[in-house]
Every structure is written in C-alpha cells, then in structure tokens.
C-alpha cells in the first residue's frame, strides 16, 4: 500500500518549473553598465519604429527561436547630454534581439522609449533581450529624471 501511495504521489508531484530569472531592470543600473563599458553608448529618449513582424517569437516545445536576430529600426528623438535630452537623434539602428531558450526580447513599433544605444563606428545598435535593461518602453518622468541625474554625476543608485 505504501508503494502504491508513493507512486501516486510521484505522479502528481509538480514537475520542475523552468522560468527565466532576471534582475529587475533600472535606468540607474543600465546607465552604470553603459558608463563602465568599453563601447560608447548614447542615451536616447524618442520614438522607435520597426517592422514588428521581423521580431523573433518565443519558442515552445521542440521549436526554439534563434539566439540572435538583427532587426532594422529607426530611433527619432533626443540624446542625453549634461543639459538633458537636448541633442537631436534621428538614426537607423540595428536591434540585436536575443533569445534565452524560449524567451525572446521584445519591443513595440511606434513606442516612446528610453534607450541605451551602443555606437560602433558610424553605426548604432540596441540590445533587446528578455531581461530588459537597454530599452525602457513608455518611460516615466522619474526614469528620465534619474538618468539625467546619473549623467550629471549625481546619485545613480537604483531603489
């Protein structure tokens, strides 16, 4: 009887859950990461335009999305300097959309964003991954204030 009960318990026991575990993104952490990077970054507040159909979809079952998909986009807005978001920015950029297993980064077409754009020579690239951190959709005023404070050398610690 004990064996039957143990067998039934084993059958109904929850299977291991697979989930993506990420540190909650913050503009302060993103600024610190970009500031410490060897590459040059530009912080831009603007409108992101892209072909959303070109974005990878998350995987399911045996079908997994590619680890990296490059998508052309346009970012139109203002980049950050010591005075704030003052420098016009109208550039074609490459979204580098990463997938971690079945989870893929995502952005929406036409969305107002705060983006940490990497500059490589004359080209611009934006990392988009499932954990976030390089692009913030519909940024709140507090986020814009925080990144301006970071740029000016003020307190740049996440809450």
Kindly give the residue locations of the regions a language model identified.
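Transition segments tied to proteolytic processing and entry into folded domains
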Residues: 18-159
């Amino acid at each position: 009887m004990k064996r039957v009960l143990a067998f039934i318990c084993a059958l109904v026991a929850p299977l291991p859950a697979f989930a993506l575990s990420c540190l909650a993104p913050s503009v302060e952490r993103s600024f610190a990461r970009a500031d410490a990077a060897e590459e040059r970054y530009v912080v831009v507040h603007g409108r992101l335009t892209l072909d959303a159909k070109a974005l990878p979809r998350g995987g399911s079952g045996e079908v997994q999305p590619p680890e990296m998909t490059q998508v052309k986009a346009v970012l139109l807005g203002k980049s950050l300097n010591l005075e704030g978001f003052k420098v016009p920015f109208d550039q074609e950029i490459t979204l580098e959309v990463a997938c971690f297993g079945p989870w893929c980064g995502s952005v929406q077409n036409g969305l107002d964003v705060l983006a940490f754009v990497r500059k490589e020579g004359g080209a611009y690239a934006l990392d988009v991954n499932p954990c976030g951190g390089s692009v913030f959709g519909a940024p709140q005023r507090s986020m814009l204030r925080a990144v301006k404070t970071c740029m000016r050398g003020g307190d740049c610690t996440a809450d």
